[in-house]
Amino acid sequence: MSEQQTADRLLGITRDGLMALGYSRELLRENYPFVDLTLPASPVERVPLAAFAQEPPSYRTACFGVALVADGAPDRLRRYASLGAPQLVTLHPRDNTIGRWMVRAETEPELLERLAPAEFQQRLIERQPEWNPQEILRAKTIKQPGPRQLDFFDVGLVPMLESAVQSKLDELLREVLADCKAAYHARHRRELNYAGLYRLIFRLIAAKLLGDREHPGPWTDSDADQVIEAVKSHYFARQRGEAVLEDANVRQLAWNRIRTGLHLQNLSVETLAYVYENTLVDPHTRSVQDIHATPRELAEYIVNSLPFELLPQDQRTVFEPFSGHAPFLIAAMSRLRGLLPGGVTAEQRHEYCVRMLAGMEIDAFALEVARYSLMLADYPNPNGWNISAGDVFASPELDARLKGAQIVLCNPPFGDFTKEERAVNPSIERPNKAAEILRRVLENPPEMLGFVLPRLFTQGASYQGLRERLAELYAETTLLVLPDVAFQYSQAEPVLVIAHGRAAATVHRRSAFVSKSDYPEFLRTGRPTWDDQGQAHLSDLRPQLWTPPLLSQLLEATQHLRRLDEVAEIHRGVEYQEPIAKFVSDEPKKGYVPGLKEVRDSLEPYLTLKPVYLRIEDKLMRSNAHELPWHLPKATANAARLTRGPWAITAAPDTSGLVCSQRFHGVWPIRDLPIELLAAILVGPVGNTVIGLQITSRDNQKRIVGAIPVPSLTSAETESIVALVREYQANRQRWMKNARTTNAMQQACHRLLLEIDAAVLAGYDLPPRLEREVLDRFAGEPRPGPVRFEGYYPPDFAPAIPLRRYLSAEYRNSAAHLTLERLKLVDDPAVSAMIEELS
């Protein structure tokens, strides 16, 4: 048998094996061309056979590449990385073997095994569950961590190719646009029709793509107008397409550059979306429309996080308001096609996706780009996509769209409405555009939703009602906070909001966070920096939607400790049926008892100030809080947060029997716990972190205060904290009585505050890095009370040294400047000369 015959036989064996894996004939392409993106010249290469997971073929859907190695040795296999297939099969006719290689993003492919034909066939049979089109496509698509990564797939391959293609295409189109503008202005004095120019560029790209994919038609003709007319006939036969730039010379110039430019056979439609965001949207339009286009990876992350497959096939209807260039619709189209059963024709797939997908967009050019992107993603089918032109907030069509959609995907504008917009549209209820569209979606809740929202959604008071509504409707939620580099042309810090599970019996609340340094890795792998999942039953108190990373780490580190509500009873103060001012006196009166009315006048750390007198009668009260044991020792704390910053709560011991108004909490020990320690727990950084990171309104809710962990302390350590608190109280009282001692007492009280905090922190025994993160929340934040406070550590102090150690005399004495002071200065000429000689 000749070498050529052996090669043909090996190719046939490989083709049959791939078909057995599930790659139908339309997913197998022979003599397939692709551009080598690893070389500056970007030459076109070919492989005898390539297998794809779905149409249209591209580096994003490529699963296997087959290469012929005629001389028996690998010959620059690196070029095949640009195909995008994670596995490369090499045919070696000289020794009648077949090689299997893992394609690397940055280096030469790695040989995994070299097999005889029969062994190769057996290997395909064994690995069918992992190597079928659906599994490989799933592995290549960014998603939440789930099943183990396929052992032959380099997760950096597709991002590397995306970056290379985007860079080359962006450079080409910027040059084309610049040349066209220059040529136009050389011939005309009137203003250039930019929409017509951009429309021309997109049509020529479509022609280039059709030609490079060898679709029947005059796509490679050198005459620009003939090609433009062919694109119009192919895609817009049933409707009138918008006009392109009227200058024939400029049209021809653009086509000459694009026709001979980067080969687009293996291009993915996501790259065209990238071109829209980076090349074809001018800064003015981006600003006016508040455009922060959804990156492809984020759209796919959201879409692949939603269980489309749980819906009946004919009910997977998707609606994308503010569709822009339709990133969610493109991602959803890919997902829908992958869920269709085998045997569905290309025409049936097209008709199905047209029925399932809908969008709405106010910007005419963005809408046109969206249709182009969908057309190209559904290559080579014509137009017909259901994207409406209109203002989402003013269109009467919105309600109908929302009622008809089972899945809503949205990246809305983050800005606020103008006064003019609100004046002409009385249906607007929220000042912010993102909050308003979420409100409207939740009025007609879909089975599933995926939103890109401002970070403020996680805990901002303006979103509290929407968070509560979302929690009521959906049992499965994910809030994934991203850094301010997620959008290319915006520094907004977004959160991905993903929700489904309308009738589940168990609640799952997932909170995740991606740091700026980890964001590139997240785009590659889908793995966040920090991930936390909570579970509860619907009968339980619903856990909050968002748990900040620091709070999660702090609660995990202290989960072995008792909570405050296990060692103390917490109750809100007395509330009157009429305004409290009617029942307050500054002087003692019959029927009145000493008490506290306003936090700002009556409470500072560890001290209650001059009390007022409250009238206490059953008939005046709204509740029975006046019957609580106010006469017993307790700690008093504010019931509403103190500041908008991290300091949320303060407290003071009380043995004088003060009755507190509803603006306070009373905290009574139910075990042998000193009230000074209760106050120190509430005043300290851990208590303020637990409360401050959970507050969604002005109130320090009783259940949140009760969740503060109680430090584990010996009797001696407890007595030490009590003594420090009493010393602080004594110094503060001396300070109030004698203003001349302000400086000395200020320093003494500052030192004592830090020592109390350090002693309480020691009882939590937090990892040093975590303790430092907790304390860093308060850096530069004024502390409630009379003591000037700028933080626990100097601004330039980086080590994670526990506060107690940092304040200790041993640590201070070991500081560098003190060490230098203890060393004697060596001023010996002989020693100096010797050191100079050694250096």
Whereabouts are the PLM-identified features?
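Short, basic/polar, glycine-containing "phosphate-handling" surface segments that engage DNA
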Residues: 2-207, 253-273, 473, 720-723, ...
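Signature of N6-adenine DNA methyltransferases within the class I
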Residues: 106-110, 123-124, 330, 367, ...
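C-terminal substrate-recognition regions of SAM-dependent nucleic acid methyltransferases
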Residues: 156-197, 201-204, 213-215, 495-643, ...
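Non-catalytic DNA-recognition/assembly elements of restriction-modification systems
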Residues: 536-584, 591-597, 601, 712-839
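Class I S-adenosyl-L-methionine
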Residues: 146-355, 360-369, 391, 396, ...
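Structural motif
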Residues: 184-201, 263-270, 428-430, 587-589, ...
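Proline-centric
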Residues: 306-309, 319, 441, 503, ...
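Polybasic, glycine- and aromatic-enriched phosphate-binding surface used to engage nucleic acids
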Residues: 68-82, 87-90, 450, 549-720, ...
